[in-house]
Amino acid sequence: MKWLIILGVLGMIGWAISSTMTAMNTKTTTVYAGKAILQAQVADNDALRQKGLGGRSSIGRDAAMIFVFDKDGDLPMWMKDMETSIDIIWLNDKKKVVHVENNVEPDFEPHEVYRSPMPARYVLETRAGTAKKFGIKPGLSVRFELEDQK
């Protein structure tokens, strides 16, 4: 019985380390959106998408995160653990902007959920004000490459 408990604890520790390492192994890509050139972390798995930009007290002027999903759909986003305002930009499978939420502020429980009225494949999160500053709006084509698309 004692060994089963020890094995269970070791298994949980291994799972936690694996999840943390997956979240830390972040890929990056350059995103060209309007007049903006952004260096984006790629969130292409559940662990990275759940963490998102949460816990960061600031976001650099040319920093972003691109959330990658397997198929188009309703991609709800929330501000869990966010400490700074952001712009949320939804893109379809052709990497065309379908919706923008400007200057979304951090919130507390219960978290407000933000959605695009159109199906999307990607979500780009940037520092608040980036979309307006660089003319990122619905209809704009965005360019970026992902490792599995090269």
Task: State the predicted function of each range.
Residues G14-K150:
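Compact, glycine-rich, soluble single-domain proteins
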Residues K2-S18:
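Hydrophobic membrane-insertion alpha-helices, especially the h-region
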